[in-house]
Amino acid sequence: MSHEKNEASGNPEAQSWKAQEAMLGVKTEVSRWRAVKNCLYRHLVKVLGEDWIFLLLLGALMALVSWAMDFIGSRGLRFYKYLFAMVEGNLGLQYLVWVCYPLILILFSSLFCQIVSPQAVGSGIPELKTIIRGAVLHEYLTLRTFVAKTVGLTVALSAGFPLGKEGPFVHIASICATLLNQLLCFISGRREEPYYLRADILTVGCALGISCCFGTPLAGVLFSIEVTCSHFGVRSYWRGFLGGAFSAFIFRVLSVWVKDTVTLTALFKTNFRGDIPFDLQELPAFAIIGIASGFFGALFVYLNRQIIVFMRKKNFVTKILKKQRLIYPAVVTFVLATLRFPPGVGQFFGAGLMPRETINSLFDNYTWTKTIDPRGLGNSAQWFIPHLNIFIVMALYFVMHFWMAALAVTMPVPCGAFVPVFNLGAVLGRFVGELMALLFPDGLVSNGNLYHILPGEYAVIGAAAMTGAVTHAVSTAVICFELTGQISHVLPMMVAVILANMVAQGLQPSLYDSIIQIKKLPYLPELSWSSANKYNIQVGDIMVRDVTSIASTSTYGDLLHVLRQTKLKFFPFVDTPETNTLLGSIERTEVEGLLQRRISAYRRQPATAAEAEEEGRNGERGASFTGDVPGEAETSFAYIDQEEAEGQQQREGLEAVKVQTEDPRPPSPVPAEEPTQTSGIYQKKHKGTGQVASRFEEMLTLEEIYQWEQREKNVVVNFETCRIDQSPFQLVEGTSLQKTHTLFSLLGLDRAYVTSMGKLVGVVALAEIQAAIEGSYQKGFRLPPPLASFRDAKNARNSGRTATSNSSGK
């Protein structure tokens, strides 16, 4: 046995075999661990690709952000009141603290947004409506906008001004949903959804934004559907409810954790009676609240729009404000803070109360008209002014905060209008409730039972009605149910909200639609049922008939002419100008790429192109080159729609490969028509071989370059090297406006080609549909277009002739 061992140990082949066996065992062990690792990774990727993981992560993240904003904002307001109380007794220092504190915060918020991301200013819901509809708005869903919106909104809310959190936070949640989706796609290796297919993700983000803003999961889903979507996919229902419920739960748990609340309760605690919440005799008062809220809501939207339109007009004041962006928020902040100074004019309309304190005081169960000693009412005591009636105080609060809120939300800071309007509605409802308590001091008697009137109930109903009138949403009633924890007032609240919507929708668009109209965002207005003329309008009446198209027989000179004559982003692609049969649609950047690749400086020297490329490879790769002829930058092709050309370079690598040709050398701009005015030779888009190529360019005269380019421009284009959309959306001339509106809304279209038996006869875009709808709304009556009248008359004559021939045939 020992002999065999010694023989084996002395045998190099045996030793080599044992070494290989050991290495094989190590490799086997490594391969096992690698297989386990790959299995775990695949499982992780599969889990991260699930919808519920995405929803839970998004809900937890948004709840944390919302809680952090509320926590910092509440501490900021406490510090504000602490500073004001420290200098009590010195009126001058009190005024200085009261004005300077919000002034510093508002200016910081405005400046921060201007530097980081100007798209963070305002509400964000109008822009989201257009994005969900299919429009592309750049930089609205980026990380920079998220940072600017979050920081700016937190600082602005700490100022104690009538500014809301709901609209901006919906925008923040949508940004988080987009960024989180991109991150999970990167981790799991999935292809990210196209820009126009992210409506479901953005809708869920909107629902989560409302849910963790107020802790209202049900209302969050419903409100997001009403406000942001014209058509909602039922498949997103469970996503919205799951994410909303989880985010609202985490948001409330965090509040309990920091001991802001004792347990999971409603955001605004109320103690209304639950056995008999209201009497039928109170329904007329609730209806009055709804009708009045409708009028005041429409007036608020009108006033807000007039302020914005005035600031956009060109005059001496607006010129100064546009040059110095911080002057406008500084002036508005100074004026509002001065008027709200508690020892001054502000003492007459409860300006010392912060927004949340105001809502809590308006929702209390006490009847102020019956209160003799207000010192035991807490914050509600600030509504009692010596020698001043409580109704006058509430009326002053409503009037002053009405125009203050309409003015404050126009400042260039992240802000919304939901909470200020909510306060206004609560004051209006409280006013009616106190008036009812004054008219019926002993309560209402019905069937031998006595029902006492609680003005706090009227305040809740007024808050829901006013916000519904401004936003044109009925789900504000559900928001109030979840905010107050009171569901016993379903009937009166729904009556008030529906009446408010009926009145407001007949007078003004919603606040978000008003901003869309002012900013001229690509969005379709709603098609009213009351417009009978819409059924007579067809696509042939509103389409653009003079269409610039590109034919399959076009030359490079024709392409250059089309680009110089129009600024369209897409062109219809037809077979020949004579037949005009629609074959597809081609993007502007694709046409630019065809010209850049064809009329190139390297194509002028085909014999020396390879040598130039080889010499350029060995030369300095980092050297830049500019071979532009002086004075010709204006007519250079490189400057035709330069922003779109730069945007095309930022596309995905796959798309860039599709349009690449066999000669991937630096392109040159297209020259001008005259030999004495040539265009630039090179662009600063490629490096390395430019300096070598310039040597060969110096050997050509301007006349030779001009003749060569003229020959190239007469060559028929080969469209096989570019991407063509072979299935653009098409309509026929007889398509009704109603059906066209539905198709554009459902599919997120921005244009459609109109054909007749395959022949291109026109194009209709959002602008034409919007003009047709708005024309049918203005002044309540719209004359049908001339073509429609001619068509209807012709159809009537044809039908008459058909009837005559049928009768004679019989």
UniProtKB/Swiss-Prot annotation:
Does the keyword field hold Zinc-finger? no
Q: Which residues lie on this side of the membrane: Cytoplasmic?
A: 2-48, 507-810
- Place the motif Selectivity filter part_2 on the sequence: 164-168
The UniProt entry, under Pfam families, shows:
Voltage_CLC
Residues the record marks as site: Gate: E166
Name the SUPFAM superfamilies on file.
CBS-domain pair (SSF54631), Clc chloride channel (SSF81340)
Q: Where in the cell is it found?
A: Membrane
Q: Which residues are glycosylated?
A: N365
**What are its GO cellular component terms?**
chloride channel complex; plasma membrane
Q: How does this protein lie in the membrane?
A: Multi-pass membrane protein
Motif Selectivity filter part_1: list the residue ranges. 122-126
Q: Which GO terms describe its molecular function?
A: voltage-gated chloride channel activity
What are the alphabetically sorted keywords of the record? CBS domain, Chloride, Chloride channel, Glycoprotein, Ion channel, Ion transport, Membrane, Repeat, Transmembrane, Transmembrane helix, Transport, Voltage-gated channel
> Where is each CBS domain found?
543-601, 724-781
Which ranges penetrate the membrane but never cross it? Answer: 125-132, 201-213, 217-225, 456-470, 471-472, 473-484, 485-489
Q: Which domain of life is it from?
A: Eukaryota
* Residues engaged in binding chloride: S123, F418, Y512
This chain's function reads: Voltage-gated chloride channel. This channel is thought to ensure the high conductance of the non-innervated membrane of the electrocyte necessary for efficient current generation caused by sodium influx through the acetylcholine receptor at the innervated membrane.
Query: Whom does it interact with, and what assembly results?
Result: Homodimer. Each subunit has channel activity ('Double barreled channel').
**Note in the entry:** The CLC channel family contains both chloride channels and proton-coupled anion transporters that exchange chloride or another anion for protons. The absence of conserved gating glutamate residues is typical for family members that function as channels.
What is this protein identified as?
Answer: Chloride channel protein
